[in-house]
């Protein structure tokens, strides 16, 4: 598997699907499944039956994972960009293709 170009804490833009165009911060990266969890994007609901711990039951809303191919890292201006790796001062860093700026994180 290739090195992860998207990391926890990155701001990303959703490129396809029901949340296309929305952006958020990566909360979790699931490398084995090639998925990411993005804050405020791809909200799913789980219906809970009443139980002893939760006597009222109800609907729990949570961020469901998105496939990593559906998101792109956002540049400083908030637009999606591709990412490449470069070596600077002997360290491997991520660089935004559009602007050429180093991505923090």
Curated annotation (Swiss-Prot):
Entry superkingdom: Bacteria
Keyword Ribosomal protein attached: yes
A GO molecular-function annotation: rRNA binding
GO cellular component labels: ribonucleoprotein complex; ribosome
Gene3D superfamilies membership: 2.30.30.30
UniProt keyword terms in alphabetical order: Ribonucleoprotein, Ribosomal protein, RNA-binding, rRNA-binding
Protein's UniProt keywords contain rRNA-binding: yes
Family matches, as InterPro entries: KOW, Rib_uL2_dom2, Ribosomal_uL24, Ribosomal_uL24_KOW, Translation_prot_SH3-like_sf
Biological process according to GO: translation
Function according to Swiss-Prot or TrEMBL: One of two assembly initiator proteins, it binds directly to the 5'-end of the 23S rRNA, where it nucleates assembly of the 50S subunit. One of the proteins that surrounds the polypeptide exit tunnel on the outside of the subunit.
Subunit structure: Part of the 50S ribosomal subunit.
Family label: Belongs to the universal ribosomal protein uL24 family.
The protein's name: Large ribosomal subunit protein uL24
């Amino acid at each position: 598997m290739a090195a992860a170009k998207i990391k926890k804490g990155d701001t990303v833009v959703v490129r396809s699907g029901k949340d296309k165009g929305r952006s958020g911060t990566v909360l979790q990266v699931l490398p084995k499944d090639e998925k990411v969890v993005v804050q405020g994007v791809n909200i799913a609901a789980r219906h809970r039956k009443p139980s002893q711990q939760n006597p009222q039951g109800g609907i729990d809303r949570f961020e469901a994972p998105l496939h990593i191919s559906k998101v792109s890292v956002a540049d400083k201006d908030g637009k999606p960009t591709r990412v490449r790796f470069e070596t600077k001062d002997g360290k491997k860093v991520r660089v935004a293709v559009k602007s050429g700026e180093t991505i923090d994180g």
